[in-house]
UniProtKB/Swiss-Prot annotation:
D-glucose 6-phosphate binds at R22, Y94, D148, R328. GO terms for biological process: trehalose biosynthetic process. GO terms for molecular function: alpha,alpha-trehalose-phosphate synthase (GDP-forming) activity; alpha,alpha-trehalose-phosphate synthase (UDP-forming) activity; trehalose-phosphatase activity. Its EC number is 2.4.1.15, 2.4.1.347. Homotetramer. Belongs to the glycosyltransferase 20 family. This is Trehalose-6-phosphate synthase.
Amino acid sequence: MASEGDPGVGSGDSDFVVVANRLPIDMERLPDGSTSFKRSPGGLVTALEPLLRKRHGAWIGWAGIPDSAEDPIEDDGLQLYPVSLSADDVADYYEGFSNATLWPLYHDLIVKPIYHRKWWDRYVEVNRRFAEATARAAAEGATVWVQDYQLQLVPKMLRMLRPDLTIGFFLHIPFPPVELFMQMPWRTEIIEGLLGADLVGFHLPGGAQNFLYLARRLTGANTSRATVGVRSRFGEVQVGFRTVKVGAFPISIDSDELDGKARNRAVRQRAREIRNELGNPRKILLGVDRLDYTKGINVRLEALSELLEDGRVDSHDTVFVQLATPSRERVQSYIEMREDIERQVGHINGEFGDVGHPIVHYLHRPIPRDELIAFFVAADVMLVTPLRDGMNLVAKEYVACRSDLGGALVLSEFTGAAAELRQAYLANPHHLEGVKDAIEAALNQDPEEGRRRMRALRRQVLAHDVDRWARAFLDALADTRAGAKPVRD
């Protein structure tokens, strides 16, 4: 064990520690210089909150504003440990390496990744700070769960500081094909960073298989050759005397909560009001996305434009609502993408709309949760058309909100969700005619066929919720090390 004062000292009392880029709070700096915060909703914190409470748990992460204090925060019984990031850290580690290098590389090079040594150096430095904060907070023999692409070096760094810990890592975005990942100048360092964990989890078996191959190729480690299955049949990598398990764990949503909220009388009344406000169209198409170039918003707009032009969709009884949450607004590729999307919206409304009757209703702002659920209830067709997406929880949220068995889901084949939601209208977003055909089929589906499809989709989503995902991962993590404490509430 490290000496007194070293980051490796296990002085903390938390038996279960979650490490993520962001804390589960939204913090803002007030005019007088002080700060305030509120809890940010999310499936991850919902799933893990009971475990965090039961096990004296802690959450390590950035509070969301530069140069915030690192004083621990207690929020309704949860212990939060902020990691302070400077404006330069945010620019280089987060906006730079995480979102201009890793994000496009892991999403099939939709936008060209940028490789800067300065960004990489800052990524290493910030990951080390997260590892040191975790080492201080974790009790002897604790379980640590590291989340996502911003922190891929933390497992190895933490292993060096605290070999007594049981460490899991889960990647929430796709893991790229081997030939794409090999472009990364620091490819070996990232693979070795992840191999510091006892369990490395991905959404789909394909990502796990890619990782196993790269571990073998880049580190020379012995790996299992068997096919990885969903929540079963784990791959293995031998790292010295340790065996690292590699598995597939498709993430999900709090489907029971959404199902209950969508049945609420006020929400259903709001859904009727939305239809009235849109002019009581025969069909409402809906898109709900963070404004990101991976989401394929431009694809659905182009498909709709051509369907209107071909007369396959009637402009007088169909509207499309696109809810786009602002994202990464200082990054040039996102600025250009927003301009392109707004240009497409203007073209469609100018070409096919009438005064007082636009075809596309485009909202570029955050939408309150209950309002979003009302949109899900109101929409006849949900359009989820990413060019690449690790899972896409919006597709599952829409299904969870349709207890009436109404509606239809058009879903990109290049989402992780497509592997589970087979009764959706699946489409290749790179094939515009295929997207158009899927939208047309969803708009004109036979009502009984629609109910059959939605019933099957709901069975899948309600049975495989976020709690089941978290338990599957944590049970597998506890099995990796003899004597590890099981994480149970």
